[in-house]
């Protein structure tokens, strides 16, 4: 699907129950699925990203630098759910969303993400800005491929896509067919309420949000949790579209409170 222009990071989805089949079923003497998983992992370039399939926004993501490190993790008690092992593509981090229903899709221009020194997005401190309009990225070709994908798979509502741009090439990192952590930002770019994305998908809209001329610039940033008085004062700014005070629980960490703000102009 993406071979003509957009590449995809090498990776493997590991089914937890199949990976541990010999431990739960005494009748299994040789776990060929586990052997296949390790064979595939050896073919991936390191470092890799290891993450479970239940989290969101890069929470719980680990970077591992060798095959031995991944093997040790998968054979340990830390491996307690389905896992993705994926090549870490170092480069500029972007995201986009697809909005609409069959026959009425908009593929938005990219939003740039800030990254950590490890080269990944930190969901608790990231900054997002878009749309990115530099023509040298040739993102219109990516939009065309994502539009074909949406039409083929008949997506409905919102679809979030993580991308990396490196050495003149685009890579698909992840596709999430749901409301995402950047949906409020894309809605601000479009100048509408996030829920309107779904209403307009059903009723139709005259605007094609794939076009930069139909979008505003939007910025999403995070800061420490604020008092109710501060939130009310902040929301009084005419450029502030959304404020979300959130409490996030991460396994092995204390609860984190932060405030997320989306502004547009």
Language-model regions, residue ranges each:
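A glycine-centered beta-loop-beta connector
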Residues: 103-104, 165-169
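Peripheral (often C-terminal) accessory segments that flank ATP-dependent C-N-forming ligase machineries
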Residues: 37-40, 199-265
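ATP-dependent carboxylate/phosphate-activation module, predominantly the ATP-grasp catalytic core
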Residues: 87-154, 176-202, 220
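Pre-DFG segment of protein kinase catalytic domains
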Residues: 172-174
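Conserved hydrophobic "DFG−1" position in protein kinase catalytic cores
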Residues: 63, 98-100, 163-165
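A short glycine-rich, hydrophobically flanked beta-strand micro-motif that places a catalytic Asp/Glu
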Residues: 155-167
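Active-site nucleotide/adenylate-binding loops and adjacent lid/helix of ATP-dependent enzymes
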Residues: 5-90, 102, 129-148
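N-terminal glycine-rich "phosphate-gripper" loop used for MgATP/nucleotide binding
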Residues: 1
């Amino acid at each position: 699907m993406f071979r003509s222009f957009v590449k995809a990071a090498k990776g493997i989805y590991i089914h937890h129950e199949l990976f541990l089949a010999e431990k739960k079923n005494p009748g299994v003497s040789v776990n060929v699925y586990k052997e296949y998983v390790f064979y595939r992992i050896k073919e991936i370039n390191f470092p890799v990203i290891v993450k479970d399939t239940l989290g969101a926004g890069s929470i719980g993501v680990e970077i591992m630098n060798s095959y031995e490190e991944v093997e040790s993790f998968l054979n340990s008690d830390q491996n307690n759910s389905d896992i993705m092992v994926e090549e870490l593509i170092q480069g500029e981090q972007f995201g986009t969303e697809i909005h609409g229903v069959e026959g009425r899709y908009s593929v938005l221009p990219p939003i740039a993400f800030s990254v950590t020194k490890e080269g990944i997005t930190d969901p608790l401190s990231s900054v997002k800005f878009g749309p990115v309009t530099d023509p040298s990225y040739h993102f219109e070709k990516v939009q065309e491929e994502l539009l074909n994908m949406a039409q083929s798979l008949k997506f409905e509502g919102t679809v979030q896509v993580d991308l990396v741009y490196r050495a003149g090439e685009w890579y698909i990192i992840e596709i999430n067919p749901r409301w995402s952590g950047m949906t409020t930002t894309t809605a601000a770019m479009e100048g509408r309420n996030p829920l309107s994305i779904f209403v307009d998908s059903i009723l139709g809209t005259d605007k094609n949000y794939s076009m930069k001329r139909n979008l505003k610039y939007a910025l999403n940033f995070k800061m420490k949790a604020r008092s109710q008085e501060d939130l009310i004062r902040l929301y009084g700014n005419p450029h502030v579209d959304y404020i979300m005070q959130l409490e996030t629980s991460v396994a092995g960490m204390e609860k984190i409170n932060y405030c997320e703000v989306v502004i547009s102009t």
